[in-house]
Amino acid sequence: MNAGAMGGEFCDLVENVTFLMPDGRLREMAGEDLTVGYRRCSEAREGVVLRARLRATGRSSQAEVRRRIDEFAQRRWDSQPRESSAGCIFRNPADDSAGRLIDRQGLKGESLGGASVSNVHANFIVNRGGATAEEVIGLIRRVRSKVRDSSGVVLEPEVTLLGRSWEEAFN
């Protein structure tokens, strides 16, 4: 995963990273050698990130850093749900917003068991209480299908499944 928000991506700051591979060995890589793209890092699919060294980007006073943290936190507080979620579910397609496409289908509030499309931001699925992984995946499947059927846009998941691929989950 190459996490990002508000115009920046995590991998832009990585100097090096250490992965724990499935066979138990450690793999270290320089940031510039990572295969990254929008919300993805190929190497992170092969192993688990144990640590990363980040590079600083300029110098700011402690007060300026605190002001920017507070500003970003307020923007998130104003635009994202407060319930438990995994963050944005789908990647934004070219020239559009996944949340806008989902909202156009009237899917805010759509539920499956304890999982529900957020009323605050349609690209979030929130846990209203006791949601299982299968309920969340089922709701993701339903939302993806409704958007595809109405607009022709196939939304791609941004979140990572553990233990199986999205291809398996969608079939």
Predicted regions mapped to residue ranges:
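Phosphate/pyrophosphate- and phosphate-bearing ligand-binding catalytic cores of soluble enzymes
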Residues: 20-138, 145-171
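A gly/ser-rich beta-alpha-beta helix-loop segment of oxidoreductase catalytic cores
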Residues: 1-15
